[in-house]
């Protein structure tokens, strides 16, 4: 008989990010601005066995919710991630992240000559060219960027 144990303890209130591709938890923590000086509990499970993905990463963040920009950024690196909102140790809401058709004002264009990188008041705007592998295109200069370009 297979033994089942909970490797990361439950949280009372906060957010669980599950089904992160194995090895990408640190990138998600970076997206969320979570560093070593936080004043809330953050639990990270990396390379956790998964029936759906073989291996996955999981992040539990006590007393913290995520905004739309953070969810959009997570969808770029973990397009199949599941978000669970926890209240009093119970899941109050559960949903998958969703890559929007356009990303406006949340990432920078890598083209230094793009109008969005000058002193003009223009927000960067990207269209999704491909989801797997991730390819984005700047609507202003047409520069394409992959996942590595976005997170460098």
Curated annotation (Swiss-Prot):
Record has Zinc as a keyword: yes
Any one Pfam family match given in the protein's UniProt record, by short name: PyrI_C
Alphabetic keyword roster: Metal-binding, Pyrimidine biosynthesis, Zinc
InterPro entries (UniProt xref): Asp_carbamoyltransf_reg_N, Asp_carbamoylTrfase_reg, Asp_carbamoyltrfase_reg_C, Asp_carbatrfase_reg_C_sf, Asp_carbatrfase_reg_N_sf
A biological process from GO: 'de novo' pyrimidine nucleobase biosynthetic process
Record note on cofactor: Binds 1 zinc ion per subunit.
UniProt superkingdom: Archaea
Any one Gene Ontology molecular-function term assigned to this protein's record: metal ion binding
Amino acids binding Zn(2+): 109, 114, 138, 141
Cofactor: Zn(2+)
GO cellular component: aspartate carbamoyltransferase complex
HAMAP family with a match to the protein in the record: Asp_carb_tr_reg (MF_00002)
Assembly and binders: Contains catalytic and regulatory chains.
Function: Involved in allosteric regulation of aspartate carbamoyltransferase.
Family: Belongs to the PyrI family.
Xref: NCBIfam families: ATCase_reg
Protein's name in the database: Aspartate carbamoyltransferase regulatory chain
Organism: Thermoplasma volcanium (strain ATCC 51530 / DSM 4299 / JCM 9571 / NBRC 15438 / GSS1)
Lineage, uppermost ranks: Archaea, Methanobacteriati, Thermoplasmatota, Thermoplasmata, Thermoplasmatales
Gene this protein is translated from: pyrI
């Amino acid at each position: 008989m297979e033994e089942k144990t909970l490797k990361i303890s439950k949280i009372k209130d906060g957010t669980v990010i599950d089904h992160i591709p194995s090895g990408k938890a640190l990138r998600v923590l970076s997206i969320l601005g979570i560093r070593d000086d936080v004043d809330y509990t953050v639990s990270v499970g990396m390379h956790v066995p998964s029936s759906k993905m073989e291996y996955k990463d999981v992040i539990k963040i006590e007393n913290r919710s995520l905004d739309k920009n953070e969810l959009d950024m997570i969808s770029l690196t973990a397009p199949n991630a599941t978000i669970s909102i926890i209240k009093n140790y119970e899941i109050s809401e559960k949903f998958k992240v969703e890559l929007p058709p356009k990303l406006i004002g949340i990432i920078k264009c890598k083209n230094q000559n793009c109008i969005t990188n000058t002193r003009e008041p223009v927000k960067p705007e990207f269209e999704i060219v491909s989801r797997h592998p991730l390819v984005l295109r700047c609507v202003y200069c047409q520069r394409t960027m992959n996942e590595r370009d976005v997170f460098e």
